Amino acid sequence: MDCSELDSTEKSKPSQLLRAINQIYEEGREESTHSETNAASVEKTMNLLKEKAETGDSQATFLLGQLHYVQGCYAEAELIFDRIKDKDPQALYQLAVIYYDGLGTKEDLGRAVEYMGRVAFWDSSEAGSVRYAALYNLGQAYLEGFGVQASSSEAERLWLLAADNGNPNASVKAQSALGMFYSRPESLDLRKAFFWHSQACGNGSLESQAALGLMYLYGHGVQRDSDSALFCLKEAAERGSVYAQGHLTACYYRRQLYSRAAALGQRVCEYKDTAAIAQQTDCLEEYVRKGIAIGMFYYARCLHLGRGVPQNRDKAKHYCTQAVRIDPLICKELQIDAAHGKI
């Protein structure tokens, strides 16, 4: 379950969370020395939060649980969050994540979805941005049938609530997800897909920026515009979208810019850990793999024909085989194009 849309306090690494806590409770707080170890700093901060929590400071109680959470002490975090879950939507949200992913406890999808639903429809303004994140995750659960009966119509309804008409403070992930949703054969509406990818891109979504590049390139949901397509793909590629890098390699090749195609394709071939890349770029791993397969296939084509690089058919065969292993379906389409002389 995704918690990446929470604010920096909730999703940060231990050192970032420590800094945030110290800024909140900076009064009477001694500055950490450079020689102070991270463990000592964590212990000092935990003691401070415990003192504040004992006086009834609800924020300190949540932050104490969150500090345990980012330290990987999930059992302790669960106990603290459980005590305040009926009053604090952020704590309830984190409990949902713990049960969904089975962090330090047995996986419980039913309870996770129940808690996420309570956050999504929390009857108070206290929920803030965490409500949008919960709506997004709840929609994802309905789309995939995790903890509930699968329902694409319910997923769509929840994502529309989470997207909030393109509100930049709402769930950008939901906006991007709607763009993907309306691009599926089962719920195809390319004009809606273009609208939502545009909203998400404007709000910073890397994945939607890459998708917009392809929509402009092929005229899907919008008039074909090769300049806008290249602009979106180049910028998304520079920001780290492997999917955009793969398609940009293809664009260069088809425009007979073989040296550029070979250089970018070779770079894409160096990517190995798709899960880590997906996490770092906040993009779906499926599309990271597609980007690598496309870039690798076109680099293999450059090597096979000696375009932009010295001809090396053994190396070309190696990369072509690797590309097929990564994404056989997309490579099958590319092989058909190659057989018909389109590549």
From Swiss-Prot:
Protein name: LRP2-binding protein
Lineage: Eukaryota, Metazoa, Chordata, Craniata, Vertebrata
Gene Ontology CC: cytoplasm
Protein's UniProt keywords contain Repeat: yes
Principal location listed in the UniProt entry: cytoplasm
Organism expressing this protein natively: Danio rerio
Keywords: Cytoplasm, Repeat, TPR repeat
Gene3D superfamilies assigned to the protein according to its UniProt record, in alphabetical order: Tetratricopeptide repeat domain
Sel1-like repeat windows: 92-124, 132-167, 172-205, 206-241, 242-273, 293-328
SUPFAM superfamilies recorded: HCP-like
Summary of the function given for this chain in its UniProt record: May act as an adapter that regulates LRP2 function.
TPR repeats: 58-91
Localization per record: Cytoplasm
The UniProt record lists the keyword Cytoplasm: yes
Gene: lrp2bp
